[in-house]
Amino acid sequence: GAVGGAGGVGGHGGSGGASGAGGAQGTGGDGGQGGLAGNGGHGGAGATGGAGGQGGAGDLTLTDSRLLVRGTVELGASAGQGSDGGHGGNGGQAGQDGVAGQPVSATAGEGGAGGAAGNGGNGGMGAQGGNGGDGTLTLSNSALQADTLVLGGRGQAGGNGGHSGLTGKDATGGTDLTVTGGNGGDGGHAGLAGDGLLTVESGRLDVQSGILLGGAGGNGGNGGDLLQSVTLSAGNGGNGSEGGTGTLIFRDGVINNTGQLVLGGSGGSAGQAGLTAAGITGTASTGGLAGNGGAGYARFEQGAGSLGTDLLLGAAGGLTAGSVSAGQGGTGTLLIQNGDFTSQTLLAGGASHGQQMTGETDATAAQAGEGYFTLEGGTFRTGQTTIGATDTAGTSQGHVAVTGGVMATDRMAGLHGTLSVGGESGAALLTGTQDTGWHRWQKGRDWLEGRLGRQLDGTLVITGGQTLDLSSPALDWQVGRGMTTLSLNAGSGNGFGDDSLTIVDAKAFVDSGQVALKTGGAQTSASAQLLMIADDNLKTGDRFALMDGNNGWQSGNVTGTSRLLDTALVTDGTGTSTTVDGADLNQTLSGLRQSVGNLLSRMAATLGVNTQSDNQGQTLVSRATDIRYIASAADSVKIVESALNIAEAGGVQASAVDTGLLPTDRVQQHLSLTRQVPHGDGVDVWVTPLYGHRDMKTLSIDGRDSRAESNYGGLMLGSDWTFSEALAGGDLRTGAAFSVGAGQNRADSGISPTRNNFSYRGVNLYSGWNREAWNVMADAGYTYSSHHVTQTLPDAMEMSALRADMQTDLFTAGLRGEYRWQTSLMDVIPYAGARWARLSTDGSRTRNSEGTVAETSNSHDTFWQFPVGVSVARDFTGNGGLNVRPWLDVGYVHAAGDTRSSARVSLPGLDGTAETGGRLVDRDAFRTRTGVELQKNNWSVGLSYDLQTTSGETDHSVVGSVTYHFR
């Protein structure tokens, strides 16, 4: 809007006219008296100044545009200044008496008296300045770039009052009090300042040097001086106008203000009373009223960016008073409803009060504007937050309210005003950090709400190792609800209200040695909660000062985030402290194996808990046992046990035994009388493909078994030579077989999901002796297995998958004997045997993408198996020499020795180990096999199905065989 024009200056009053001189007496005879001179005319009154013109309103809308202004964008024009009143005119001077005539023949007559002087005219009135026009700018999907942004015009000064005129003069030049000067004209009032409104519907706002919302109030005009006559008056000063209101509505977009954001214009100074000349007892004129500063209001509904370097809410009152008090400072209001915004500092209130006139009865006169900051949603981050100032008597109050969203500030100074946090569960104030997600505090709050079964109302987070001082008697504060209605000096009404949550960074205050909180004797509700963040290498034996009073939280309402540590409050005459002890893991981590629990307790006592450690073992254990990461204690146990027993979770040892004994079983089937494949002198070459599916028990946690599914396949290639009647009248068969295969174990139930991709290769030497119904078999074998285990952690752990590479070596030797009864229906073949096996597992390193999580030692385990059973078979001979032999085998296997592997696991940087191991074989196994052999000439082909069941495993396999007999 255009600036209002200044009013025209009032015209000065005209001076009184001088009287005419008395007439001269005639010469000669007795002349008559000279006639009286006429009175001088009165001076004319000065004209009233013309009013200033009104500024026009400006309205601009930008759509899909970009506006670059190399200077200042002003919305809302300044008011026009009131013009000065005209001075009163001076009184005129009296005329001289007439001159006596000269005697000639008679007596000369006397000259006539001079006429009286005229009065001075009154000064004209100063005119009112024109009003500044309002300015409105709307951005829709547009960008505005400017050096400075000013919303709300400045108020202007009122005009000065005119001086009173001087009294008239007598004929001799002396003062003639009967002839008055003119009255001084009053100064004109300043026009109204225009309001400014900027609305950002969407787009971008870039300001380099700062944003000012709310114009400054104008100064009052000074009164005119009373120069002489007590019966006259000087003109009064005109009133200064109030600053225009500045409003910023930011609906969505990006703001980047690299200067200050000032909300509220300063108040103007009052006009001074006119002076009274020396010796004059009258009262001089009054000065004009000062204008109040315009209010500044900013509302951010959505968006992101920097609001400014310094946010100043509330402006100072006027500096000086006259016959009236100075103007009030404009209030500053900043409201954030959503979005993500930042600044370097926030000062709410703390502006200096202006000067009040002597005897002022209005306590609010010349007061500085108060500052109001409200966060209803979203996030706001700043470096320093100050509420009010130390000089509580001479400055305005500040008000900070977090009713929703998260406010994070590095430093907080609560001096004068109010602070409240609450209104909904998400409302939170973080002090000591600008990280709104600091240390996953929201997860701790969510866990606590879940345990309590209700939402908490308002959260205060204290970190950074710096004391949060809320003890100022001029500060009213509360977290949560139900303490008191906020009003200054509420005393014990301050404190932690119903269902409030206070979160304290324990390690930060252990390290700094400072008390975390000064409350000034505040109260704590019986339902208020305290959550201790146990992290950053906090360990058993640490201690810190929590608060300066004893009105703390009830012991049942104090919770630590780590299940490895116990935090307790201790009060004495000086305040409340927190001690850190080792937790009873039988209570906090029920089901954890004793040796693992001892290892974790040792970590908590020596390394401490640290969810962000470079030591990945410490990080994994700390996160797994922290309520901010894993809500369920049972899940904590599962994750830790799965990670430290990754080999068992992946079924490494069980698979190594199964795939290592599988070739020996195929060799014995190849040599068994059950298949009745004729072997004459010469060489046999045989190939056996196989596929298996296994459902097996892996890791047992808290008495509950976890299971894995395994799918594997392999191929055996063997060859042997038969020597007829080569030993004790029986046939001797000797050969060797090579095996190769691969598979995968998938464990998803009851543990962290684990995959074991394994492969194996081996060699077996075997020999069989057969004489009539007797058959004895012996073998020795070696199998090497390679296992690549991957374990996926829950998403809440925010860690990459665990990996471990393991190698195993299985050596085995076995002996089996069988006898064949031939009946008219079938062959009945009972058998019995013994097998020795030794499994060696190399040491391994469990790791993730950041480093080592755990180290597992090597292990050596030896066990025996004793199989017994019976098989039946029958031959069917067809045309063309084809022989078909179906068979069925039922058996039982008992195991003794090391049926479980045993190793030790350790964490990086920590002395001490825990026991770990996995299932090798079950004590008792039942086996059923059935198949058919087809033989013709030199070829034989077989197919069988095997089923083995134990308490921990069910194994299904399909095996084929192809044999060629060289004769």
Region locations from a protein language model:
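Outer membrane beta-barrel transmembrane domains
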Residues: 764, 838, 847, 854-967
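Extracellular/periplasm-exposed beta-strand and loop segments of Gram-negative cell-envelope proteins
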Residues: 46-52, 85-92, 120-127, 161-165, ...
